[in-house]
From Swiss-Prot:
Protein name, as recorded: Large ribosomal subunit protein bL12
Gene3D superfamilies per UniProt: 3.30.1390.10, Single helix bin
Organism from which the protein derives: Stenotrophomonas maltophilia (strain R551-3)
GO cellular component: cytosolic large ribosomal subunit
Highest taxon in the source lineage: Bacteria
Family stated for the protein in its record: Belongs to the bacterial ribosomal protein bL12 family.
Lineage: Bacteria, Pseudomonadati, Pseudomonadota, Gammaproteobacteria, Lysobacterales
Alphabetical keyword list: Ribonucleoprotein, Ribosomal protein
Xref: InterPro entries: Ribosomal_bL12 (IPR000206), Ribosomal_bL12_C (IPR013823), Ribosomal_bL12_C/ClpS-like (IPR014719), Ribosomal_bL12_oligo (IPR008932), Ribosomal_bL12_oligo_N_sf (IPR036235)
Keyword Plastid part of the UniProt annotation: no
Example GO molecular function: structural constituent of ribosome
Task performed by this protein: Forms part of the ribosomal stalk which helps the ribosome interact with GTP-bound translation factors. Is thus essential for accurate translation.
UniProt entry tagged with the keyword Ribosomal protein: yes
Oligomer and partners: Homodimer. Part of the ribosomal stalk of the 50S ribosomal subunit. Forms a multimeric L10(L12)X complex, where L10 forms an elongated spine to which 2 to 4 L12 dimers bind in a sequential fashion. Binds GTP-bound translation factors.
Length: 122
């Protein structure tokens, strides 16, 4: 006769804390597992990852400003797009480059802001 999960849970609920701890230890030994929560390991790795410096940046054009012609020229130089595509991107705004290096992102931002655009680097 096989026990259901509900019957097993009920049987464990009737045991004392010491008996449950002994049961857990026996299960760990029998199956070669640990009752330690894997979340604790992942949480410990989280802060270490946050300390790492960001290496890839996204350059986003927010606004072309008043000097649209200069901004369109800068967008063309950065992206290599044609005139119409660069004009559409300058007017609508949007992502100019994903996964840019820090130096590359800073140069793009500097060039676009010099042309009169509003730029965001994430």
């Amino acid at each position: 006769m096989s026990l259901t999960n509900e019957q097993i849970v009920d049987a464990i609920a009737e045991k004392s804390l010491m008996e449950v701890m002994e049961l857990v230890k026996a299960i760990e030994e029998k199956f070669g597992v640990s009752a330690a929560a894997p979340v604790a390991v992942a949480a410990a790795a989280g802060p270490a990852a946050a300390v790492e410096e960001q290496t890839e940046f996204t350059v986003t054009l927010k606004s072309a400003g008043d000097k649209k012609v200069e901004v369109i020229k800068a967008v063309r130089a950065i992206t290599g797009l044609g005139l119409k595509e660069a004009k559409d991107l300058a007017e609508a705004g949007g992502v100019l480059k994903d996964a840019a290096s820090k130096d590359e992102a800073e140069k793009m931002k500097k060039d676009l802001e010099a042309a009169g655009a509003t730029v965001e680097v994430k």
